[in-house]
């Protein structure tokens, strides 16, 4: 039985990669990487996101200047069709991932009830 669970996990991994939503994220990501300005904007977003997460984990809040930078970056992203498509595709994929997470972790949740 213990080997079977790994087989199921590997099967799930392949099934996720085969999802049209996953394929769409890959497709849009490749388009972003092929465009230098869009790729740079995406990298700025990732860096800003990591910075904000780090601040929040340490209990800090973004300054007014940082909030302005975040808003400006958000506006640039909203104006970029490729990035907009990427985040929409990510959102569609995240629905599956949330459902899968809920299903997979249900037995562990039962243990703490």
Curated annotation (Swiss-Prot):
Coiled coil (residue ranges): none
Pfam families: Com_YlbF
NCBIfam families: PRK13676.1-1 (NF010209)
Membership in a protein family: Belongs to the UPF0342 family.
Designated name of the protein: UPF0342 protein SpyM3_0545
